[in-house]
């Protein structure tokens, strides 16, 4: 959905692609975490390609520019179903009609825990190698109990965006959107999704350490209550709860002057007044990965697709089309245009992404490793969200 799609087309397309999209960079490795999941064997060898592969994907991930060449090379016809939300992706994958999904972190754990996807044999995916950026390997959202379930596609941070005409001094903290005395009260943009609760948790991790939050997606009942209380206070200062199709106009129209955003949306304003920063407290973010259905009807074509789209050239095409950092860092060396894109999205800057907690599905087994308490689930977050907005 980018390169760079005109507004409002870009924002509308982005809405389909990221509404609910992919968590954890900072401290969110799956190392040592054990969660009970269905025992599904992974493929040991590849066979002959089937005639097709059926894919559920965000808009912009499966396009003729690269899908047609894949079909010519493999004989696998690509059948695409565009999904608008992670919830829709989960529902579609549970029908058994699709082989692959471009899952985000707020969907992937649901698919893994419920046995909807199978672990992957990365030896059968040659392009899943050293060129895949380290920060997109072994993360909670697609790796569990030592098994890889997802082949990374791309990532991005939820940055703090601001209008330099109004916010004259570059902010370095999320305090400008959370504290009651913010000079920008009434002009603050907030993301309209239950997963935004994690943004409040990130701020509380830094400002109220006594709450004991170690992972913004692992909140017990009291920690969730604290995050919801902060969100309710913020509600009094919010100008708009945005989705990707309204974010750009909220800023360009002057309704909002500061708030959470995505780098691709900032660029979509085509206005240098709007700048961004990754605040000192860190941030949430999103990351997407290909996942294979537990009972895929076309697994060989699916493996071929995962390998093909993990090459530097094709992964880079997807990243530029969508507006995100590519998973294959080798893309950044292919051309001046590729390098510029990678620089814009901090593609290979692991120090940058070490401060980002990529979206992950909150589940009752605490993702921070605690055993003495039950954590809140995404259903709990979904139930709490309407109380925030009033």
Regions flagged by a language model, labelled:
Residues 33-111:
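Early extracytoplasmic/lumenal segment of secretory-pathway proteins
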Residues 19-31:
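Bacterial lipoprotein signal-peptidase II cleavage site
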Residues 61-63, 102-252:
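Extracytoplasmic ligand-binding site segments that recognize negatively charged/polar headgroups
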Residues 293-362:
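Mature extracytoplasmic/periplasmic domains
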Residues 354-390:
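Conserved C-terminal helix/tail region of periplasmic/extracytoplasmic solute-binding proteins
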């Amino acid at each position: 959905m980018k390169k760079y799609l005109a507004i409002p087309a870009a924002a509308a397309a982005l809405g389909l692609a990221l509404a609910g999209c992919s968590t954890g960079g900072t401290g969110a490795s799956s190392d040592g975490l054990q969660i009970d999941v269905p025992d599904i064997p992974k493929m040991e060898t590849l066979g002959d390609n089937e005639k097709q592969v059926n894919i559920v994907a965000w808009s912009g991930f499966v396009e003729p520019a690269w899908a047609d060449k894949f079909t010519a090379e493999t004989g696998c016809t690509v059948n695409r179903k565009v999904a608008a939300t992670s919830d829709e992706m989960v529902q579609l994958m549970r029908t058994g009609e699709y082989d692959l999904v471009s899952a985000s972190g707020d969907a992937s754990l649901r698919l893994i825990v419920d046995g909807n996807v199978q672990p992957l044999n990365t030896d059968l995916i040659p392009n899943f190698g050293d060129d895949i950026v380290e920060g997109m390997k072994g993360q909670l959202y697609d790796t569990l109990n030592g098994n890889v379930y997802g082949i990374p596609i791309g990532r991005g941070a939820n940055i703090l965006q601001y209008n330099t005409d109004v916010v004259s001094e570059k902010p370095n903290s999320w305090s400008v959107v959370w504290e009651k005395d913010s000079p920008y009260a009434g002009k603050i943009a907030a993301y309209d999704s239950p997963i935004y609760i994690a943004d409040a948790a990130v701020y509380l991790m830094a400002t109220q350490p006594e709450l004991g939050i170690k992972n913004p997606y692992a909140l017990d009942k009291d920690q969730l209550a604290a995050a919801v209380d902060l969100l309710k206070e913020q509600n009094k200062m919010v100008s708009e709860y945005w989705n990707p199709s309204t974010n750009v106009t909220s800023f360009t129209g002057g309704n909002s002057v500061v708030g959470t955003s995505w780098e691709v949306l900032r660029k979509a304003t085509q206005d240098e007044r709007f700048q961004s920063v990754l605040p000192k407290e860190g941030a949430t973010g999103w990351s997407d990965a290909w996942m294979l259905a537990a009972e895929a009807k076309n697994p060989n074509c699916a493996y071929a697709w995962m390998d093909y789209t993990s090459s530097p050239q094709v992964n880079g095409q997807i990243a530029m089309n969508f507006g995100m950092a590519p998973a294959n860092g080798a893309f950044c060396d292919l051309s001046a245009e590729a390098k510029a894109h990678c620089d814009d999205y901090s593609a290979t800057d692991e120090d940058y992404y070490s401060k980002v907690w990529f979206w992950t599905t909150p589940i009752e087994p605490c993702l921070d490793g605690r055993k003495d308490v039950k954590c809140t689930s995404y259903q709990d977050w979904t139930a709490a969200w309407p109380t925030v907005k009033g």
